[in-house]
Structures are given as C-alpha cells and as structure tokens.
Amino acid sequence: MKLTIAGDSHGKYMVAILEGLPSGIRVDEELIRRDLFRRRNCYGRGKRMKMEEDAFEIVSGLWKGITTGAPVTILIPNRAGNPVKDVRSVPRPGHIDYAAWVKYKLPDLNIYVERSSARWTVALTAAGSLLKSLLKEFGIEVLGFVTRLGNVEARDIPGDFEELKRRRDESVVFCPDPEATKEMVAEIDRAKEEGNTLGGKVKVIARGVPAGIGSYSDLFKKLDSKIGSLFFAIPAVKGVVIGSEEMWYGFDYLDEFELEDGKIKRKTNNLGGIEGGITNGEDVWVNVSVKPIPTTGKPLKSVDLRTMEPAKTPYVRSDVTAVPPASVVCEAALAVVISDALLEHLGDGNIDDLKRRFENENLPRWNDGFWKEHYR
C-alpha cells in the first residue's frame, strides 16, 4: 500500500491518494467526517479551524461506496486564505523557516510554511479514517487520546477499551481523565493569556492486531520502524516510544508468557505489542511526545535575514496547542501503518479473499507440526 499526500496549506485542496487497497471494502464516510470534525474542533484551536469545514470528496477508487482496487483519491478544500501578504524574513525558533531557507534559498519564509504547516495532516486523518473500514474487517480498532498537556498529566485512565473511548469522546481535549480535562482547559486558558504555547503527550492503541504482522529480516519493514517513520513526519512530534516509557529493570519490564485455554498470553504489555519488529498478539501501544507550537503570541528573539539585524518574531495565525488534534492525527497514522503491514502480509485482491487467508492462517506447530498446536 502507498499513501501520497499533497497540497499547500493555503492552496485550493489538500489531497490524499491511497494505492494498493483491496476491492470490496465498504467505506464508512460518516466515520471520516467524525474524525475530521474531532481534529478540527477541540479546545486550544485557533481562528483558522473556525474557517475550515473539511468537506472531503472521494473522487476515485470507489463504486457505490466500496473500493474497486484502483487508487482512492480524497480531496479536502482549503477555505482559509493566507493572512500573511508581505514577504517574511524573520524566522521563528522551532519552525521550518530558517533551516528551509538555508537549503532551498527562496527569499520568502512564507513559501516553506505551505508544506510544513500541520494543515496537511487533514489529509492523513482522512486517509487513516478511511483505512479504519479495512481494519474493521479484521476486528482491529485504533484509539488515540491525550495523556499530558503542559504540566497536567492524566492520572485516571480506564483499562477497559470501551470506557476509555467513551471518556475520551466526552473530553474537549480528548483526555479520558475528567479531572485532568478540567485542569488542561485551565492550562490552555493560562497559556493563551500569556501568549505562550503548550506541548504534551498522546497515546494510541491498536486493539485486535494479530501476532505475526511486520518483519524482523527487513529492517525497514519492521513494524516499529514503520511507526517511527510516519509518526516523526507529523509536525510537532519529537518523541515516539512503543510500549511503556518505564524500562529500567528487566524483571519489571519484560512481558512474561502464560497459557490460557490453549492460547499464549502475556501478564503485562510493557513492550507495546511488538517484539523484534513483529506483532506478538497483544495490543499495540504508542506513546508520542508533542512539542509546543513555535508560533507564540509573545514575540521571541530572532534575526531579520534580509538585514542581518536582531529582530522579534512576527505573530502568524496559530493554535495554543497541537496536542489534542495530534491525538486524532496519530490515531490515523497508526491505522495507516497497521493497514500497510496487514496488506503486505495478506496480499492483494478482494477483501473476502484476504479475510479467508486471515481466518485460515494457523499459528505454527513446533517441529513441523508433530507437537501441540496453539491458537490466536
């Protein structure tokens, strides 16, 4: 499977193209609408998100709502115009401005923002949301939520998946801890008043991923390699940890095996469902660190590249925090990575053929099948 994303932040469209999908997947367009709404409407967003509608259109690859096997193209119009009309020559610390100017040498810092802006994640969100219809065929669900925002950390995170999802959806910052949600809202209000921005952490879970997806032999097909590659492409993502972030002692960290009704299970899931680049049958857990947005309301020290004199950074329309929407984007990103690895494992064709391959795939027996079998 191949995902291509194109479009400028203030151009006519953002575009996502998915190639290599099987035919026969019934696409849930209402789910795509809901995910795009969640990305757009969360606490801490700026003025632009009030202008955008994200009214997507799927212009190829579907027939009567199901995939045909041809490339699926999603168009999302941009409604907001570019608020900066003048040439900008003062780079913002933490943004692409200076580094891109050094490499590409075009004399207007506005140019580089068009690609590096997080606006392109609307296309990633749409693509990942569409792929949830594929994952659903195999009983796989993906869920992202906020675990930290500024100095506020979630303390009461339910272990039950459905309860976690319900609480997440009730929170304006997508945090499943109601008390932490209130504190996060206050933290955002305080940062906005100060002209500051906030970073934080999000967690994404993929439930129902079978054992044996990924690779250990091809370093770049290892599932954790793919997760890191796509997640680090998301603007503001500065850290990706699969599984527990507490990994100091082996006795505490390593997930011991146990048998339960002929099935191999784990007592814990500190490894986050991946060992050596391959899924082990437990839920896949990804922890993501998101930096503060580099456009602050209070000017920072910089240099005017045109005059080479000290200068203050300009204010460009922006959010107070990218953390809540990042939980939606990272959820979509994990859906993309799992879908890609799953299709690599099961092959091409019609979705019913892939499901039969999946259902008929037995786990191996030791020593060419002469010993006891075990089950997924």
Curated annotation (Swiss-Prot):
Cofactor note: Reduced FMN (FMNH(2)).
One term of GO molecular function: FMN binding
One Pfam family matching this protein: Chorismate_synt
Coiled coil stretches, renumbered: none
Residue positions binding FMN: 115-117, 276, 291-295, 317
Any one Gene Ontology BP term: amino acid biosynthetic process
EC number(s) on file: 4.2.3.5
Sequence intervals crossing the membrane: none
Cofactor: FMNH2
Reaction catalysis annotation: 5-O-(1-carboxyvinyl)-3-phosphoshikimate = chorismate + phosphate
Pathway: Metabolic intermediate biosynthesis; chorismate biosynthesis; chorismate from D-erythrose 4-phosphate and phosphoenolpyruvate: step 7/7
Keywords tagged on the record: Amino-acid biosynthesis, Aromatic amino acid biosynthesis, FAD, Flavoprotein, FMN, Lyase, NADP
Assigned GO CC terms: cytosol
Residues noted as binding NADP(+) in the record, renumbered to the chain: 39, 45
Assembly and oligomerization: Homotetramer.
Role played: This reaction introduces a second double bond into the aromatic ring system.
NCBIfam families on file: aroC, PRK05382.1
Family recorded in the similarity comment: Belongs to the chorismate synthase family.
PANTHER family, per the entry: CHORISMATE SYNTHASE
HAMAP family registered for this protein in UniProt: Chorismate_synth (MF_00300)
Protein name: Chorismate synthase
